[in-house]
């Protein structure tokens, strides 16, 4: 009886034209706390696949506009997951060594700090000026797998503004930082420039 009742409320189904009430309730709850520029929810399996979906969205956005943009920019020492897209944008080769020859086209930049912010901005702007960058993916404020390497919101905000000026999709990987772990609902809220896409997973399930 319990299984039958559950099946009537929570269908195990791909959301391609289908949905169910628990998913609708969760989507509405998320929309109530996400930054105001977030308008859509896309459900995936886990943190790694949420990153893959975000990268595909960014690449398809430019494809649909007729722009030949296929490069992704990510931070050095970042970690975004174990699926191929997520590994491509991760910077820790200890996890990715055997697969690196098959990755997406990714350019990695240093994490900005007080000492290098100007040089990082110059490098970032130079890369974006080539007009082949589709997206910039980052872990806001802290790189968890890199031994909790922190960076300041003011420096990240400067990069996000530069990306916006070049029509680059900003992707915040908040799989680790989301849902109050940094003192706000989302680490992205410490910046004045909101990401175009936010990836969530941990603490959601």
Language model feature labels by segment:
Residues 1-205:
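Conserved N-terminal phosphate-binding loop of PLP-dependent enzymes in the Aspartate aminotransferase
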């Amino acid at each position: 009886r319990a299984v039958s009742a559950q099946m009537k409320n929570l269908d195990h189904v791909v959301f391609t034209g289908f949905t169910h009430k628990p998913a609708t309730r969760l989507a509405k709850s998320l929309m109530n706390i996400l930054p105001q520029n977030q308008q859509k929810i896309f459900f995936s399996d886990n943190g790694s696949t949420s990153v893959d979906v975000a990268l595909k969205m960014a690449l398809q956005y430019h494809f649909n506009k007729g722009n030949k943009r296929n490069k992704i920019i990510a931070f050095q020492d970042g970690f975004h997951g174990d699926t191929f897209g997520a590994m491509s944008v991760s910077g820790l080769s200890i996890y990715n060594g055997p697969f690196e020859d098959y990755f997406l086209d990714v350019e990695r930049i240093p994490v900005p700090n007080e000492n290098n912010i100007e040089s990082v901005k110059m490098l970032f702007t130079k890369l974006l000026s080539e007009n082949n960058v589709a997206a910039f993916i980052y872990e806001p404020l802290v790189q968890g797998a890199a031994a909790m390497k922190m960076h300041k919101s003011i420096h990240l905000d400067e990069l996000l503004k530069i990306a916006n000026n070049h029509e680059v999709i900003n992707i915040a990987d908040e799989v680790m930082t989301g849902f109050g772990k940094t003192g706000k609902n989302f680490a992205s809220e410490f910046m004045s420039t909101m990401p175009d896409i936010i990836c969530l997973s941990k603490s959601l399930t």
